C-alpha cells in the first residue's frame, strides 16, 4: 500500500506512539475494511491509521463537505450540548446529545476516538470530536448511520426528558442559524478577524483577539503604539481561537516587543488566554509566553502537547487523490516533558455562562481589575 510505505518514510518519526509491528497490523486491518467499504468511507478508514501515529499534524484530509447535520455541539465537562442549530433543529438548542440512530453517545465517542490523534491532550479531543460527530460521512464510516441523507438524533433535557429529532444535513451558507445566547460574549464577536483589539478604559485593559498571523507585523505595531501611550494598562491576549500559523511571526511581533517593555512584562499586567482550540503555532507561542515572559496564562489548556511532532507537510495518494498530512519535525517548547501546557489559572467553559453570553475568563479578568 502506497500510503503505508510513504507515511513512515516521510514522517519525522512515525513510530513515536505505536510500534512498527502495531502500525503494520493496523494497516492490514484498515486495508481489509477499505476493500469492503463504500468510497465515502475510505478517508475515515485511513484516519484510523494516522490517529494511531499519535500527533495531530498527521492526518488524512477529509473531503470538504457542503452539508453537515444542522446542529453545532460543544463539550461542557462530560456533557455534549447543542450550542447552535438551524430553524429545523432549534428545539434542540441547549439540550444534551444522548444518541444518534439509537447508538448511545458513549459508543459514538469510543468510535470517534479511533480517528482522532491519540497522543495529544484530552482538550484536543474536545475540540475535534464535535465537528466529526455532525459529519454524515464520518458517522456512516463508523457504522452509526446507514443513510447519508438523514439520521435520528436523541437529545436529553435537564429534566431528563428525551427529545427525538430526525435531521437532514444542510449547507452552512444557506441555513438560518440560531445561537444558544441572545448576545455573544466579546471573544466570539470577532471570529473572522485575524487580529483585533479594543480598549476597556474602566478596567484599564487592552483586550486582544489573536486568531491568526495574517498581517501581524503591522497590526502589532498599532497595538504597541497604543500601549506606549497607556503605560499603566494591562494587556490581555486571547488565543482561544488561534489554530496556528508561523510561530516565529508571533514571537517576533508580540513576545519580543513585550520583552523590551519591562513595565508591561509582569504577571499582574500581562495575561494570555488559551483554550482547547489553541493549536500548533499558537500553542508554541503560548508556551513561549510561559517560558520567556512573566505572563499569567488563563483559560483551558491547549489541545496540543507542548513537546511534540509538528510542522505539517503533505503528499497525495495516487488513486484517491486524498491529501495525507504528516509531521516533519519534533519541537520542544518546554524544558520538561509535561503532557500539557497548564494555565496558571484554569478556567473552564460552563453551560450556564455560555447560554447567558458570559465569558468566565473575561469575568475573572474584570473582577480582578476592580480588586
Cite the ranges covered by each PLM segment.
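Flexible, low-complexity junctional segments that flank or bridge functional domains
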Residues: 1-234
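C-terminal "post-core" interaction segments
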Residues: 1-4, 157-160, 187, 192-371
Amino acid at each position: 500500500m502506497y500510503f503505508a510505505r510513504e507515511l513512515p518514510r516521510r514522517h519525522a518519526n512515525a513510530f513515536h506512539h505505536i510500534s512498527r509491528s502495531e502500525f503494520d497490523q493496523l494497516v492490514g486491518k484498515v486495508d481489509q475494511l477499505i476493500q469492503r467499504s463504500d468510497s465515502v468511507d475510505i478517508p475515515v478508514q485511513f484516519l484510523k491509521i494516522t490517529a494511531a501515529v499519535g500527533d495531530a499534524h498527521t492526518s488524512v484530509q477529509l473531503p470538504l463537505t457542503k452539508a453537515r447535520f444542522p446542529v453545532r455541539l460543544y463539550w461542557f465537562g462530560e456533557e455534549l450540548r447543542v450550542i447552535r442549530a438551524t430553524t429545523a433543529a432549534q428545539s434542540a438548542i441547549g439540550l444534551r446529545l444522548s444518541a444518534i440512530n439509537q447508538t448511545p453517545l458513549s459508543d459514538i465517542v469510543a468510535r470517534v476516538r479511533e480517528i482522532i490523534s491519540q497522543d495529544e491532550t484530552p482538550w484536543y479531543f474536545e475540540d475535534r470530536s464535535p465537528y466529526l460527530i455532525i459529519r454524515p460521512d464520518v458517522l456512516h464510516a463508523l457504522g452509526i448511520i446507514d443513510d447519508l441523507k438523514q439520521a435520528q438524533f436523541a437529545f436529553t433535557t435537564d429534566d431528563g426528558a428525551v427529545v427525538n429529532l430526525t435531521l437532514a444535513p444542510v449547507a452552512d451558507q444557506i441555513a438560518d442559524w440560531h445561537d444558544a445566547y441572545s448576545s455573544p460574549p466579546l471573544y466570539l464577536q470577532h471570529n473572522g478577524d485575524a487580529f483585533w483589539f479594543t480598549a476597556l478604559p474602566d478596567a484599564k485593559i487592552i483586550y486582544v483577539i489573536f486568531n491568526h498571523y495574517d498581517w501581524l507585523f503591522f497590526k502589532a505595531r498599532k497595538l504597541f503604539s497604543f500601549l506606549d501611550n497607556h503605560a499603566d494598562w494591562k494587556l490581555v491576549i486571547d488565543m482561544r481561537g488561534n489554530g496556528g500559523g508561523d510561530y516565529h511571526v508571533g514571537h517576533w511581533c508580540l513576545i519580543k516587543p513585550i520583552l523590551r517593555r519591562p513595565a508591561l512584562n509582569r504577571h499582574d499586567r500581562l495575561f494570555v488566554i488559551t483554550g482547547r482550540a489553541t493549536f500548533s503555532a499558537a500553542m508554541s507561542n503560548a508556551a513561549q509566553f510561559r517560558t520567556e515572559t512573566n505572563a499569567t496564562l488563563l483559560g483551558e489548556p491547549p489541545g496540543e502537547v507542548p513537546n511534540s511532532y509538528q510542522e505539517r507537510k503533505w503528499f497525495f495518494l495516487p488513486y484517491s487523490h486524498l491529501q495525507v498530512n504528516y509531521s516533519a519535525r519534533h519541537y520542544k517548547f518546554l524544558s520538561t516533558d509535561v503532557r500539557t501546557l497548564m494555565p496558571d489559572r484554569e478556567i473552564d467553559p460552563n453551560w450556564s455562562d455560555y447560554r447567558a453570553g458570559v465569558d468566565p475568563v473575561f469575568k475573572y479578568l474584570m473582577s480582578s481589575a476592580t480588586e
